[in-house]
């Protein structure tokens, strides 16, 4: 914020007088950073700093008032610039100068400084007014342009080997092309990128022969457009003589004249292209998984509301099922969405029941990894079946048990996955009038995802569910041939 000059201190005490109030208002509200100093006070201190100056430097008003402007200087400030400013102030002369100053944060910036004396009607010096402008980007660009100019001068004055070394360090190839003849000179890195030998002559047609057919016409069009003198940039693919496909990026500009000469650089961007492709793949995969998750949430909501008429109970069931879904997703995240083993699925889905029924829930089977969609469906199904077992089945008394087993078996000359949920020693079960959520998951989602046959039997000994599914890479990714076959008793 700017220093509040109200009520105005008399001029003799160092501030602006009421007579200069319109000037003060103009300075305060301009977007240009401005300072006013009083040369009649010791060390020519700041008596006004507008908000734009405080924003530029990062200082608060009370941190700059009463100080000489030299607090903006630092180790990088050129003493010659400081001397020039002192001389102008001593001579009561205006000065324009670019000087390195420092913000409160310690960040250096190029300050385009203008200082001008302000005299009263009698010609007596009254104040100094200064404006600041951060021209760091402008001067940096000028420095970059100067470096480019020097680089081209070095190319002419020094040996070709030195230039080749510079561009090789940056992994950028440099080339020139005579527009009409097509003859080219190439740096060592340029030759490496295209797969040329160090001594072989290079012609534009030599490069064009390497460009894949789909990109060749675009490369030709861009090359012909160079004669206009406009710079161009293009990405295209080549196939080297060793059969390696590479993505290249070329930037070029022609020096126009009677015999135009095209100057260009080339860079191998194959790895960047692969990263972009992987990023796009991940984005599509995330969208796909989000869509699947939303479909599962919608299914859970529909099934819960369809079969539960008490709103409070429906809310509780929906929350429990979403929690089970969340646990399945957490498990998949740990495995980088590569799926999970059936052992992991059982352990995670049945974790809420293990503290009470740990010795009554048994699981066994080989190490089998299933896909992410099957992981979610199995997790929800196991959770629902266990919940129903607590209410009506084997876990509703003191001695009932649940056995979950899975195996790879031979069925009609074909390997198949067999999983069984078997409840025993519980109360006698009766077939319900309608299927519960867990059974619907087994019949619909699992049957669809695993292409499985699902048999449910309400036996006198307890609920018995058998799932039989073919072995496919989509459902069982990376399953080797070393998984032993066995039959579930």
Curated annotation (Swiss-Prot):
Annotated region described as HWE histidine kinase domain, given as residue ranges: 259-341
Residues in PAC domain copies: 93-147, 232-281
Domain PAS: 19-93
Record PTM Phosphohistidine, positions in chain: 288
Pfam families listed in its UniProt record: HWE_HK (PF07536), PAS_3 (PF08447), PAS_9 (PF13426)
Modified residues (S-4a-FMN cysteine): 69
Known EC number: 2.7.13.3
Keywords carried by this UniProt record: ATP-binding, Chromophore, Flavoprotein, FMN, Kinase, Nucleotide-binding, Phosphoprotein, Photoreceptor protein, Receptor, Repeat, Sensory transduction, Transferase, Virulence
Post-translational modification: FMN binds covalently to cysteine after exposure to blue light and this bond is spontaneously broken in the dark.
Highest taxon listed in the record's lineage: Bacteria
Any one GO molecular-function label of the UniProt entry: ATP binding
PROSITE patterns cross-referenced by the UniProt entry: PAC (PS50113), PAS (PS50112)
Catalyzed chemical reaction(s): ATP + protein L-histidine = ADP + protein N-phospho-L-histidine
UniProt cross-references to NCBIfam families, sorted A to Z: sensory_box
Function noted in UniProt: Photosensitive kinase that is involved in increased bacterial virulence upon exposure to light. Once ejected from an infected animal host, sunlight acts as an environmental signal that increases the virulence of the bacterium, preparing it for infection of the next host. This photoreceptor protein is directly related to the bacterium's survival and replication within host macrophages.
Record protein name field: Blue-light-activated histidine kinase
